[in-house]
A protein has these predicted regions:
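Short linear motifs at protein or domain termini
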Residues: 1-96
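An amphipathic alpha-helix signature
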Residues: 7, 11, 130, 180-183
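Generic hydrophobic alpha-helical segments
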Residues: 14, 113-114, 177-182
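Short loop-to-helix capping motifs
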Residues: 31, 140-143, 185
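Hydrophobic faces of stable alpha-helices that mediate helix-helix packing
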Residues: 80-87, 104-108, 172-176
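Conserved amphipathic alpha-helical segments that form helical-bundle/coiled-coil interaction surfaces
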Residues: 100-163, 175, 190
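C-terminal regulatory/effector modules of DNA-binding transcriptional regulators
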Residues: 164-190
Length: 190
């Protein structure tokens, strides 16, 4: 049994399970089984599931339960366009002051982690992507945009992990380029 006390820690573990497609054969997240797995009551499980629903990783269906939101090839381009639009909106709403050095150091730290990770391993790739999401979302001061960014970026993470299976070098290079670009942009803005 994996002990996790907070709903945030439970949500993090479930995000990893969803993104890495592990241990969820039927596409459902069952409250009772999750409560047993994490050694908690159903209250923190419900809170974690509520957060995942807010991020559009799952859908809570009356009489059915919590269902993982599927990735549909026909909606992939829409998912990407939505993420781009949210990123552009966040940039337009960014405050005029320079990025605090702590944010720059966070991105540089993630870049350093890439050098010691095996990015062709889905778990390592997921960890780097999840850290990048957290770092970028923390920079977005508008809470509505930050939440929208998180939902859209989790979707992109799921797509990129699918692509990792067939094109690991391309995905790793793209991730490194993204992080380097973010670091350069932040360095010139500080």
């Amino acid at each position: 049994m994996n002990q996790a006390k907070s709903s945030q820690a439970i949500a993090e573990a479930l995000r990893a399970d969803i993104c890495l497609n592990r241990g969820i054969e039927d596409g459902m997240l069952h409250e009772v089984a999750l409560a047993q797995r994490f050694g908690v009551s159903r209250t923190p499980i419900r809170q974690a599931l509520q957060r995942l629903a807010y991020e559009r990783m799952i859908a809570v269906k009356s009489g059915v339960g919590s269902v993982i939101t599927p990735l549909e090839d026909t909606k992939r381009a829409d998912d990407i366009r939505a993420a781009v639009a949210i990123i552009e909106a966040a940039a337009k709403c960014a405050p005029p002051h320079p990025v605090p050095p702590v944010h720059f150091m966070s991105i540089v730290g993630i870049l350093g982690m890439m050098d010691i990770c095996e990015l062709n391993r889905a778990e390592d790739f997921f960890d780097i992507r999840a850290r990048l999401l957290a770092a970028l979302a923390d920079m977005i001061e508008n809470p509505i945009l930050s939440d929208a960014f998180r939902a859209a970026y989790w979707r992109l993470i799921r797509w990129s992990i699918l692509d990792l299976a067939t094109a690991p070098q391309h995905q790793a290079a793209h991730l490194r380029e993204l992080l380097q670009s973010a670091a350069r942009t932040m360095k010139t803005a500080t």
